[in-house]
């Protein structure tokens, strides 16, 4: 993060703009809207500045820039078309430890001005760090269309209710659930927009007096195979509303960065063949946090119901009467194959696909005869350590040794690595790869050279 986003309280504080043209005017509007006591210095001014000065909204100082203008300032903006003058203003401000923005020269500035969506008291700022103002503007326009104009009224009304809500609801969890109900209540929003005081009061009383469910809840969320862009919209919404996030090793750092900043994070460290936290203990963590009235997200790589033991976790919650829901994720088979240029099914090569766990332990034996059949694709999860056994068994039951195979490591991530070969090489190939990896076996692997798109990007 190159810049710390902050919102400055400038009401009745001295600010200086050096420049009297159109760019300076745009900056002046922002500072006036923020209530600043504004001085503008320039050799000449466009008419708007004169009109503001005549209305007593700001002070004009006509003439060359003098550093003494900064003596009482909280904040300054250099907005002239003279680069040398802008640099001089910046250096003079820096020597006085005054924040200074230099228009179109972010490297010379001690702060930058973001694009702003104003739904006061709700403010949203979008910045590209000065590298691409056009991109920031485009993002602002998209956000403008998503945020209702009356959102500011709802936020302001919420501020008026804070004292009462604090008295009414004892815990932070109860208050948060109340606020979530209020902010998504369309009737209240419309009543505020129409200034319908009767409807505002009725809706508010109904929301406050409705009994809250004191039980917490658990949401099982599939994080997808790695690329944060593959996280579903609903999954994103859930992790941003969570009080507690219980996650494992397969959840990428990019996805973890999307979690609510004040949420508790509990790492349970699961990976193929190794469990830092036993499954039963994970079940109890979910149960314990939910019983405290918290909203818990169990965040799993891929899809929670495909070799994720999500069903076992939900059985524990169900037996304890804890509400739960599931947000599916893109499973590793889909993500890794797509990012490797390997279609799992193909009219000419595979009419079915099988997802198989590579955990060949506790004496369990797979149906190798059916797995060795033609016209299908096999995807082995967590099969890296058993690759030699998989190779031996499939050949033993009749699969041709020249059957194409691929191993995908860190699928969909920027660190993705793929090697391919034939079934007779599978055990040897596996020794070159690290977990997490996925094994794909079938004729469709032969299409990889033609369809591989990700490595070219």
Curated annotation (Swiss-Prot):
Catalytic reaction annotation: uroporphyrinogen III + 2 S-adenosyl-L-methionine = precorrin-2 + 2 S-adenosyl-L-homocysteine + H(+); precorrin-2 + NAD(+) = sirohydrochlorin + NADH + 2 H(+); siroheme + 2 H(+) = sirohydrochlorin + Fe(2+)
What is the recorded name of this protein? Siroheme synthase
Q: What does the organism's lineage look like at the top?
A: Bacteria, Pseudomonadati, Pseudomonadota, Gammaproteobacteria, Enterobacterales
Binding-site list for S-adenosyl-L-methionine = 225, 301-303, 306, 331-332, 382, 411
Query: What biological function has been recorded for the protein in this entry?
Result: Then it catalyzes the NAD-dependent ring dehydrogenation of precorrin-2 to yield sirohydrochlorin. Finally, it catalyzes the ferrochelation of sirohydrochlorin to yield siroheme.
In the record, which residues are listed under signal peptide? Answer: none
Q: Which SUPFAM superfamilies does the record cross-reference, listed alphabetically? A: NAD(P)-binding Rossmann-fold domains (SSF51735), Siroheme synthase middle domains-like (SSF75615), Tetrapyrrole methylase (SSF53790)
Which pathway is this protein assigned to?
A: Cofactor biosynthesis; adenosylcobalamin biosynthesis; precorrin-2 from uroporphyrinogen III: step 1/1; Cofactor biosynthesis; adenosylcobalamin biosynthesis; sirohydrochlorin from precorrin-2: step 1/1; Porphyrin-containing compound metabolism; siroheme biosynthesis; precorrin-2 from uroporphyrinogen III: step 1/1; Porphyrin-containing compound metabolism; siroheme biosynthesis; siroheme from sirohydrochlorin: step 1/1
* Membrane-spanning residues: none
């Amino acid at each position: 993060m190159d810049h710390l986003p902050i919102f400055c309280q400038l009401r009745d504080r001295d600010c200086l703009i050096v420049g009297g043209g159109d760019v300076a005017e745009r900056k002046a509007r922002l500072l006036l809207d923020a209530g600043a006591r504004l001085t503008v210095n320039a050799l000449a001014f466009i008419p708007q500045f004169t009109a503001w000065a005549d209305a007593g909204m700001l002070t004009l100082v006509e003439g060359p820039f003098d550093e003494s203008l900064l003596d009482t300032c909280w904040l300054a903006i250099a907005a002239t078309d003279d680069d040398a003058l802008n640099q001089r203003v910046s250096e003079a401000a820096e020597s006085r430890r005054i924040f200074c923005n230099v228009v179109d020269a972010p490297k010379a500035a001690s702060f930058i001005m973001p694009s702003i969506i104003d739904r006061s008291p709700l403010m949203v700022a979008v910045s590209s760090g000065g590298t691409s103002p056009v991109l920031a503007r485009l993002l602002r326009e998209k956000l403008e269309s998503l945020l209702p104009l009356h959102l500011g009224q709802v936020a302001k009304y919420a501020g008026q209710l804070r004292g009462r809500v604090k008295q009414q609801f004892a815990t932070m969890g109860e208050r948060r659930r109340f606020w979530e109900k209020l902010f998504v209540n369309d009737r209240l929003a419309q009543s505020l927009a129409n200034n319908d005081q009767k409807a505002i009061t009725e809706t508010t009383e109904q929301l406050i007096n409705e009994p809250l469910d004191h039980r917490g809840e658990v949401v099982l969320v599939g994080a997808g195979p790695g690329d944060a862009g593959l996280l579903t919209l609903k999954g994103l919404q859930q992790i941003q509303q969570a009080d507690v996030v219980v996650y494992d090793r397969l959840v990428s750092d990019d996805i973890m960065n999307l979690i609510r900043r004040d949420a508790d994070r509990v790492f349970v460290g699961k990976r193929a063949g190794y469990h830092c936290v036993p499954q039963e203990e994970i079940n109890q963590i979910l149960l314990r946090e939910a019983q405290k009235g918290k909203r818990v997200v169990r965040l799993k790589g891929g899809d929670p119901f495909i070799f994720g033991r999500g069903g076992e976790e939900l059985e524990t919650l169900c037996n304890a009467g804890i509400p739960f829901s599931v947000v599916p994720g893109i499973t590793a088979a889909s993500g890794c194959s797509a990012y490797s240029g390997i279609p799992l099914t193909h009219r000419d090569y595979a009419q079915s696909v099988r997802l198989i766990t590579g955990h060949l332990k506790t004496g369990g034996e797979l149906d190798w005869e059916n797995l060795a059949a033609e016209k299908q694709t096999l995807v082995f999860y967590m099969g890296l350590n058993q690759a030699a056994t998989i190779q031996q068994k499939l050949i033993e039951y009749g699969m041709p040794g020249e059957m194409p195979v691929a191993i995908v490591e860190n699928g969909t991530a920027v660190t993705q690595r793929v090697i391919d070969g034939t079934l007779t090489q599978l055990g040897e190939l596996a020794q070159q790869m690290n977990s997490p990896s996925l094994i794909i076996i079938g004729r469709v692997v032969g299409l990889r050279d033609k369809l591989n798109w990700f490595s070219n990007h």
